[in-house]
């Protein structure tokens, strides 16, 4: 069981410009969702999170269910892993509907805590 100390206050992204700003940050892809992360360079500010579910992933009932599952996963287990001064946008994928909830929370925690591996530079840019 988690205590109040384990849960960190997580703010919300609400306006379109806030969501668009996060797109300039790094992306962390996964089978259940895409996580976009932006460092606001504000270590005193709270972490903020926004949720996106596009219309191509189902009707309103299914989209709302995906959004509710993501919100609950952040509330229960992933909020503590979010770094202060960072913005997070979670873009749901269709497989999120049928995934077990514990797999969802585990994947979310892993994506938040682990930075993506560095991509190799293009072949022409290497020094010999």
Curated annotation (Swiss-Prot):
Its EC number is 3.1.26.5. The keyword Electron transport does not apply. Pfam families: Ribonuclease_P (PF00825). It is an enzyme of class 3 (hydrolase). The keyword RNA-binding applies. PANTHER family: RIBONUCLEASE P PROTEIN COMPONENT. This is Ribonuclease P protein component. It comes from Rhizobium meliloti (strain 1021).
